[in-house]
Amino acid sequence: MDIGCYPITTSRFIFGEEPTRVVGLIENDPDFKTDRLASAILDFPSGPATFTCSTQMVHYQRMQIFGTKGRIEIEIPFNAPLDKETRIFIDDGRDVHGSGIVTETIPLTNQYTIQGDVFSRAVLGLGDVPVSIEDGIANMAVIEAVFRSANSGAWERP
């Protein structure tokens, strides 16, 4: 799973817990034999998370987090372009017209350079690793369960 790892990681981070089961659909590219379109439902003890991602559809990237009193939308959250600021829209949910939306802007940055710098500092003993090996293993268990579900057509446990 290519970009599906990002919404899975983010969902686990937001909920602060692991999903108990997942169901997924995956379409593979017939030439490259890689996943090109994936959708999944992750069933967490606190509620569901859903995502759809693709490597071969129109360029569009958003993450939306819905709560009972509002929502947050992040524009281009996972590979922000080097020439465009990232915007976060915070909606207090006062109406369906979005009159309660406040926009926060994150300045231009190179996420991959920062990631490389943080990793290098950790390797040199100058900082902590921001994500543990255990977290990576837990994320991989969810990804593998989505693949199993796509093959079985049933809910699977990570």
Where are these regions (language model features)?
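Short glycine/serine/threonine-biased micro-segments
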Residues: 2, 22, 65-68, 123-124, ...
